[in-house]
Amino acid sequence: MPIDQYGDARLDGVSLRSLPKISLHDHLDGAVRPDTIAELADDAGVALPETDADDLTDWIAERTDSGKLTEYLTAFDVTTSVMQTREQLTRVAREFVEDLAEDGVIYGEVRWAPEQHLGGGLSLEEAVEAVQEGIEEGEDAAADAGRDIRVGQLLTAMRHTDQSLRIARLAVDFRDRGVVGFDLAGAEDGFPPSRHRKAFDYLTEQFFPVTVHAGEAAGIDSIRSALLDGRALRLGHGVRVAQDLEVVARSGDTVEVTFGDLARWVRDREIPLELSVSSNLQTGAIAPWGEELQDHPFDLLYQLGFAVTVNVDNRTMSRTSLTRELAILAETFDYGLDDIERFQLNAAAGAFLPVEEREELIDLVTDGFDL
């Protein structure tokens, strides 16, 4: 199965790109087109490590393929450097939506950290408005091209700063203006969700949806804190939940597992796992199990009934698309179209939308896979 970032792949004779998809874990600053980075940097006089788009892509790859989350995150200094003005944010957001639509995404949630985009003099509110303007322009452009897509914002607070309560209030203020949820991200080690209890208390009081990056670089304690302190409705990555499972026997496709209390809670409550297999490989998130895609516990979690979803994390950093991620999983674990559909249904059910709109997404996915 030929797989590339922007191309297509076929499964059982069907174009994967043509199928309706839901994208829940998609970073705006991880998805800026390299040629856009180069152009915006040139216009703004921003110094880049490489000025040619292809060379810049290679430079980013060197950092993101390191096997360490901390090194992986350094590439974001480049993308955020050209996301500091209203015009820059609007363009990047518009192109992001266009790229999702081209990828066959019908509903997406884009996460980004407003506190990292104030260098051009914008207020937090102005930054959110700029991104929303770009999203709406992208949705309109996609509709003109015959592709219907809806995208909501997830406002991210950085776990190593003290701005989480401020960002939480910002998210709630914009809940009727394009923002659908709150996220906590950044280096996990040393910065547990418990440091941000005031923000999470406020969000709980406001009945506002929360997802938390957890179980990526850190272990099950980070997931425990995301659930207990963050009251997360979804887990950003969450792959380390598999460390709370003990495989006691295997026979063919059958596996016998002993569940820890945390893993059983996540599975039984159908808490969506926002898994991103390419990114997890790049950052070393699957190191406890190995270094190859086939070592990823995705399939184990899926077979055990966890609410697994498939995501890109960072399109530019991982040089990927949702089509590509699905193709990789299908090739690695011998999945068929029924499995691909299940991943989309899990994502639709976990979207930060009213139940009626989630049901509409489920119907769109079901109809799109009725081939």
Regions found by a protein language model. Give the residues of each.
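Short HxH-centered metal-ligating active-site micro-motif
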Residues: H213
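Metal-cofactor-binding active-site regions of metalloenzymes
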Residues: M1-F208, E216-R234, R240-L371
